[in-house]
């Protein structure tokens, strides 16, 4: 009985809410009926005639001034709306109407009704959004001295932003320094060098750190109580100084490789010494962790130098050995370097083996993983794929798998196809990328465009199918298909990472709000009316009268019908009651 009573109350409440929703129409017709009934006591006809007489006495200059003023106001509103939309990404009028006027008019936010039921889901999605907007180190980043600086010398443009370089400085301080650096003079100098903003000051500090190691220190060794001798001992080389010089001072890849080889000798010695002492305390453990990062970084960059110089097989071997020796250091994403090198060798079976290990649901995805998987599946069918034949006979199983892989990759990063299909021009990739963002798309396409071109028909298949992804995810910011909803923070972060001369790709495309379009149309229309009224006042007057008579013709027709239906003495009968 209690449940039945509660159900009846809910139905009654819903009926009342429904009736209140449409009650304003009843009020509107009631007001119209009362105005018609009270037209004689209120002297509506006399007032209308007075208004029409006043309007007839107005000169065309008044209408010109009126339309000009309204055009000016509409233009000011348009400028303000456009500025607000460019800055905040939404319409001011729309935001005010939704946020303030809608509650006053009885509108209810859908999110508030589901707030208590979806708090856990909201927190999970917020955490996912934060993780997806994290900036990552670009595993395929270029060399500053040998590549980025050469671009600046040729074009006069800076390919790296201050924000990107500042993130690199923070990475260097994290990987290459520790709390005990003050105990070794060279490391203390390098600790300051990584914080230095001026490139020349950093290079000078690296040379200073190497010069300190050239100074021979005398170590007193007592042999007998009556005499002593002096032993000459060389201090260990500073590996991080060689790293900085290889990255920023070397103007060619060959010079950078020589410096990295010197850094490898110094870094390997420091790593072996700290490995033996790592269990003697937290200080030695921190030193060993730092030396491990230095050694891995040097070996990875040496492999990249070999790849740049055309020794691809040697680079693949170095990367495989590095991944076996340090399997837990996933922060460098060495497998992405390995995938690119294997694609250059056209070792597609080895590429598939690497993907089978790293394209796992528990591991963070990347454009390299998703698009490489799509490339392998497209390779099996792309040479014989034809859109006309596929539309007649349908897609085969292999073609369907390839299309699904492309849709998966495009959903993860929708910016990549424009660069692979050369619809947008490429620039040098930044040192940091935002996953699923334009920066990641540039970094991927910069190195992998040649691999897609090498596979016959792969770009044709991509061109025919990539836009179909967007039909599956009509609202990508709210709900995804195979991945989480597309993060809304990518545009802001990419503008910080990419240089100003590059036009950042935005997804999904922001459409101009209705109020901006309406204001623009109103501004243009009133300005045109003001100009025409000023040039042709008599003709515009005739046109205005004809327009108003046509506009009010249906209302006059309805009023005549109402007068013919209702008796003329109805008002007197109502007053008698």
From Swiss-Prot:
Topology in the lipid bilayer: Multi-pass membrane protein
User: Which Pfam families does the annotation name?
Assistant: ST7
Where is the major localization of this protein? membrane
Which source organism does the UniProt entry give?
Mus musculus (Mouse)
Quote the InterPro entries the UniProt record gives. Answer: ST7 (IPR007311)
Q: What's in the keyword line of the UniProt record?
A: Glycoprotein, Membrane, Phosphoprotein, Transmembrane, Transmembrane helix
Spell out where the chain is glycosylated: 47
Subcellular location(s): the record lists: Membrane
Any idea what this protein is called?
Answer: Suppressor of tumorigenicity 7 protein
Chain segments annotated as transmembrane = 15-35, 62-82, 512-532, 539-559
Instruction: Name the family the entry cites.
Output: Belongs to the ST7 family.
Where Phosphoserine occurs, residue numbers?
A: 386
GO cellular component term of the entry, any = membrane
């Amino acid at each position: 009985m209690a449940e039945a009573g509660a159900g009846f109350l809910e139905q009654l409440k819903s009926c009342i809410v429904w009736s209140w929703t449409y009650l304003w129409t009843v009020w509107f017709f009631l007001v119209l009926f009362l105005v018609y009934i009270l037209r004689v006591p209120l002297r509506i006809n006399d007032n209308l005639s007075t208004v029409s007489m006043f309007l007839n006495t107005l000169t065309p200059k008044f209408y010109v001034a009126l339309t000009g003023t309204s055009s000016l106001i509409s233009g000011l509103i348009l400028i303000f709306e456009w500025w607000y939309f460019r800055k905040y990404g939404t319409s001011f009028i729309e935001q005010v109407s939704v946020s303030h006027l809608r509650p006053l008019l009885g509108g209810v936010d859908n999110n508030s009704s589901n707030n208590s039921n979806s708090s856990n889901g909201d927190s999970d999605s917020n955490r996912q959004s934060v993780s997806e907007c994290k900036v990552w180190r670009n595993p395929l980043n270029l060399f500053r001295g040998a590549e980025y600086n050469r671009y600046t010398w040729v074009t006069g443009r800076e390919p790296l932003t201050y924000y990107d370089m500042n993130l690199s400085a923070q990475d260097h301080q994290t990987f290459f320094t520790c709390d005990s650096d003050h105990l070794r003079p060279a490391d203390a100098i390098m600790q300051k060098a990584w914080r230095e903003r001026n490139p020349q000051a950093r290079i000078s500090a690296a040379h200073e750190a190497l010069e300190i190691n050239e100074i021979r220190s005398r170590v007193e060794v007592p042999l007998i109580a009556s005499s002593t001798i002096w032993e000459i001992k060389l201090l260990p080389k500073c590996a991080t100084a060689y790293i900085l010089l290889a990255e920023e001072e070397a103007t060619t890849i060959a010079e950078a490789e020589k410096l990295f080889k010197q850094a490898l000798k110094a870094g390997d010695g420091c790593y072996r010494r700290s490995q033996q002492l790592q269990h003697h305390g937290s200080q030695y453990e921190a030193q060993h962790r730092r030396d491990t990062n230095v050694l891995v970084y040097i070996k990875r960059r040496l492999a990249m130098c070999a790849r740049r110089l055309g020794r691809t097989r040697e680079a693949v071997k170095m990367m495989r050995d590095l991944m076996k020796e340090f399997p837990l250091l996933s922060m460098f994403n060495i497998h992405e370097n390995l995938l690119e090198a294997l694609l250059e060798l056209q070792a597609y079976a080895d590429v598939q083996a690497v993907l089978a290990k790293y394209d796992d649901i528990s591991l963070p995805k990347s454009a390299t993983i998703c698009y490489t998987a799509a490339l392998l599946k497209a390779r099996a069918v792309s040479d014989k794929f034809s859109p006309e034949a596929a539309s007649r006979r349908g897609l085969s199983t292999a073609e369907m798998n390839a299309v699904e892989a492309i849709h998966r990759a495009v959903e993860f990063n929708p910016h990549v196809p424009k660069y692979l299909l050369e619809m947008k021009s490429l620039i040098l990739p930044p040192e940091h990328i935002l996953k699923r963002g334009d920066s990641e798309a540039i970094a991927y396409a910069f190195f992998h465009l040649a691999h897609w071109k090498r596979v016959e028909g792969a770009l044709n298949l991509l061109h025919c199918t990539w836009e179909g992804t967007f039909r599956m995810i009509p609202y990508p910011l709210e709900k995804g298909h195979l991945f989480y909803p597309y993060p809304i923070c990518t545009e802001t972060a990419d503008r910080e990472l990419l240089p100003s001369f590059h036009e950042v790709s935005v997804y999904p495309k922001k459409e101009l709000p209705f109020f901006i379009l309406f204001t623009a149309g109103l501004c243009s229309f009133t300005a045109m009316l003001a100009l025409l009224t000023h040039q042709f006042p008599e003709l515009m007057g005739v046109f205005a009268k004809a327009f108003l008579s046509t506009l009010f013709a249906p209302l006059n027709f309805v009023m005549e019908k109402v007068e013919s239906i209702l008796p003329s003495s109805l008002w007197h009968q109502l007053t008698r009651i």
